[in-house]
């Protein structure tokens, strides 16, 4: 239900917008401004009445469409100019809903407040957004924003949209401004949104618009996001079993976009040449580590406990630890010759750089398997299961499934991450949409050495997975063979906004480069 506010509050909000519009008219601004239709994409939440008052009170806004059961809005409608309001019970995120919305729009721009969000626009925000959209030629525009906090407002900068920003969970904030003409032309050129689409209509529209026009970020806060009662999107939404129908729809939409962009790859793969040079062992388990005194011994013992009919070793690349990790590794290496303790000369290595130290060393085996210094193999058969998978087909990379656990190995949500969405026909294409390949990862080293890892500490595995999948087939194991531990000292613990932006931007850049490379490969 909407939180009812006093009549005076809604009237004040509308009056504030009208007073700003009056000042703009005096300055000769509004006469040159395009008009806007606004849409609120779901039912009322906290303080939605104030947001509604702002929109109906703005001269630029000629229409406000709300999708919600009418009885939830009856009280709010009586407090504002209802001539601008249009109610619908059709889900605007669906194909039929968005089609009907676009057909009803007669203004130059469509302003959408995304599902579950409530905002308060800054003074002059609508005028500023329209100006930037017009002058930049944007088909789709979004902006930075403020968040409410106990100490006041916190600026929330977003990241710029790239050609590779094709993931369906790209963070546009709470508000987007869409050129009506751009939307209609995109649908005329690339086809209408399918009537069967339940959740991905905006995603499909965005990708179609981006094929010809810019998606523009306005790096100024245009609104304050009011705290909502819903939590943030999960890091593992794309592999949550409860979301598989949703994810399948998103994959279909992304696949069509990749085909239009001429970067979609058919399921034909380059064969792996198994006539490799001699290696000291069949397999090496690679553990990069820095300052994991609490967990590194568990990881190493898990690796050394593997049973196999072939020789293997464990290569730990100790990235100049300062917390006692080095001493623990020295003790373990002294008691088991299979443990190779490497300390690189370079002091500027990320996780990817540490992987390079291991795979280019003379100790590395023919197959390199991943084990993070926080994590454990599920049992003593993990090594055997992964290496056996390489023998089934011409795989350059094999990926298993894992279970997320706490420090004491108790399963925590979402539990099993098995990437059941992966298919031989389309897995490497859908990999451009999602955020990761899974774990544990294993590589055929002769091919891995030709590629190498980027010297980063985030996304280095994703970069290599994309590069390998461009040419070679990736094998999958769907049973859990790995424990991924989450605890307060873990590098996958909750990230701050700046780190999340940096990581998301880097992965979008990787996708951009990979899409360019695939397009060139297909044109040769």
Stretches with model-predicted labels:
Residues 28-31, 52-62, 301-311:
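Short, acidic, metal-binding catalytic loop of nucleotide-sugar glycosyltransferases
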Residues 68-76, 117-119, 318-328, 347:
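A conserved acidic beta->alpha catalytic loop
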Residues 92-104, 345-363:
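Glycine-rich, basic loop-to-helix element that forms the pyrophosphate-binding segment
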Residues 123-155, 381-414:
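Conserved donor NDP-sugar-binding/catalytic core segment of glycosyltransferases
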